[in-house]
Amino acid sequence: MFCEPKNLVVLRQLSRQASVKVGKTWTGTKKRAQRIFIFILELLLEFCRGEDSVDGKNKSTTALPAVKDSVKDS
């Protein structure tokens, strides 16, 4: 799966490296393109973490709520 922990580390590293390059070397159109790339990387990172981009709250990671055992043995 794309959102495995090792891939999240790679996404963070790419985002940081891209941020440094924007500040030091690129200008004009290239800088704008790289900022878009950084934005996309950060969106992917938020998606993989399960964060909601609208309100910043974490989404529930459980598929179904826990079921209580209502049947008791006699």
Swiss-Prot record:
Residue positions, PTM Phosphoserine: S15, S19
Protein name from the UniProt record: Agnoprotein
Membrane-spanning parts: 36-52
InterPro entries found in the cross-reference section: Polyoma_agno
Record family assignment: Belongs to the polyomavirus agnoprotein family.
Domain of life: Viruses
Membrane topology: Single-pass type II membrane protein
Protein's job: Alters the structure of the nuclear envelope by interacting with host CBX5 and disrupting CBX5 association with LBR. Involved in the perinuclear-nuclear localization of the capsid protein VP1 during virion assembly and maturation. Plays an important role in the release of progeny virions from infected cells and in viral propagation, probably by acting as a viral ionic channel in the host plasma membrane. Allows influx of extracellular calcium ions in the host cell. May contribute to viral genome transcription and translation of viral late proteins.
Gene source species: BK polyomavirus (strain AS) (BKPyV)
GO-annotated cellular components: host cell nuclear membrane; host cell plasma membrane; host cell rough endoplasmic reticulum membrane; membrane
Lineage start: Viruses, Monodnaviria, Shotokuvirae, Cossaviricota, Papovaviricetes
Modified residues (Phosphothreonine): T29
Side Extracellular, residues: 53-74
Subunit structure: Homooligomer. Interacts with VP1. Interacts with large T antigen; this interaction may impact upon the activity of T-antigen on the control of viral gene transcription and replication. Interacts with small t antigen. Interacts with host CBX5; this interaction induces the dissociation of CBX5 from LBR, resulting in destabilization of the nuclear envelope.
